[in-house]
């Protein structure tokens, strides 16, 4: 069984890591990064919600009445 012959493992692993390193470098170098990101407005927009506020309140377990 050739898998049990450990004499070629180092060469195989080294070749695999080198190939992956080169491929990732080529893939990353082709990516175009935005040169100047646009500033976004920090104003918070008011959303019109169709539900009532009383049904959307989040209750903390410690603030609930004891039963």
Curated annotation (Swiss-Prot):
The modification N6-acetyllysine is found at residues 54, 57. The modification N6-succinyllysine is found at residue 54. The keyword Cell inner membrane does not apply. Keywords: Acetylation, ATP synthesis, CF(0), Hydrogen ion transport, Ion transport, Membrane, Mitochondrion, Transmembrane, Transmembrane helix, Transport. GO terms for biological process: proton motive force-driven ATP synthesis. It is a single-pass membrane protein. Pfam families: ATP-synt_8. The keyword Transmembrane helix applies. The chain crosses the membrane at residues 8-24. GO terms for molecular function: proton transmembrane transporter activity. One of its GO terms (cellular component) is mitochondrial membrane. It is found in: Mitochondrion membrane. Component of the ATP synthase complex composed at least of ATP5F1A/subunit alpha, ATP5F1B/subunit beta, ATP5MC1/subunit c (homooctomer), MT-ATP6/subunit a, MT-ATP8/subunit 8, ATP5ME/subunit e, ATP5MF/subunit f, ATP5MG/subunit g, ATP5MK/subunit k, ATP5MJ/subunit j, ATP5F1C/subunit gamma, ATP5F1D/subunit delta, ATP5F1E/subunit epsilon, ATP5PF/subunit F6, ATP5PB/subunit b, ATP5PD/subunit d, ATP5PO/subunit OSCP. Belongs to the ATPase protein 8 family. Subunit 8, of the mitochondrial membrane ATP synthase complex (F(1)F(0) ATP synthase or Complex V) that produces ATP from ADP in the presence of a proton gradient across the membrane which is generated by electron transport complexes of the respiratory chain. ATP synthase complex consist of a soluble F(1) head domain - the catalytic core - and a membrane F(1) domain - the membrane proton channel. These two domains are linked by a central stalk rotating inside the F(1) region and a stationary peripheral stalk. This is ATP synthase F(0) complex subunit 8. It comes from Talpa europaea.
């Amino acid at each position: 069984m050739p898998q049990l012959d450990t004499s070629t493992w180092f060469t195989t692993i080294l070749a695999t890591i080198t190939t992956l390193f080169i491929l990732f470098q080529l893939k990353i170098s082709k990516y175009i990064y935005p040169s100047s990101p646009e500033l976004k407005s920090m104003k918070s927009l008011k959303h019109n919600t169709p539900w009532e506020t009383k049904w959307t309140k989040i209750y903390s377990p410690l603030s609930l009445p004891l039963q």
